[in-house]
């Protein structure tokens, strides 16, 4: 039992060090992770190899021009680049808002592409869309860091 308690104590010390490290670095890691996702997805659209390209075209062809996917790709790359640069981060967040709202558009315009059985059984495309809720939460965390809290 004594051995276990010693090992447990050592584990807790390591866990505490990791927790302190994450307290300092986790938002930076989150910023770069979201930026990487946006740059990657944007490049896929830019080069015409995005797995959701057809869904984007189908859900926007009634309102946006044919080359919109390329513009969207550039838009997403800008979001990613701006999130990497602290002085431009707020612009990345502002660009993110209409982009992420647009990602939910197929739920309205093409529900048959998003659901096997409405409202709970999703297609692969539906999964792809709903995972954007995680990106929304991540960007909310990033946005919360734009201003330092003043001591009161």
Language model features with spans:
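Membrane-interface extramembranous regions
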Residues: 1-152
């Amino acid at each position: 039992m004594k051995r276990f308690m010693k090992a447990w104590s050592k584990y807790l010390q390591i866990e505490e060090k990791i927790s302190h490290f994450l307290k300092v670095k986790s938002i930076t890691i989150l910023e770069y992770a979201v930026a990487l996702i946006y740059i990657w997805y944007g490049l896929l659209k830019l080069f015409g190899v995005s797995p959701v390209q057809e869904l984007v075209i189908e859900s926007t062809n009634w309102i946006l021009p044919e080359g919109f996917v390329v513009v969207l790709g550039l838009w997403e790359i800008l979001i990613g680049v701006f999130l990497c640069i602290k002085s431009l981060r707020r612009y990345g967040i502002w660009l993110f808002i209409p982009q992420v709202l647009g990602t939910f558009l197929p739920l309205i315009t093409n529900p048959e592409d998003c659901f096997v059985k409405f409202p709970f059984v999703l297609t692969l495309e539906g999964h792809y869309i709903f995972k954007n809720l995680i990106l929304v939460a991540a960007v909310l965390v990033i946005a919360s860091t734009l201003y330092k809290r003043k001591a009161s």
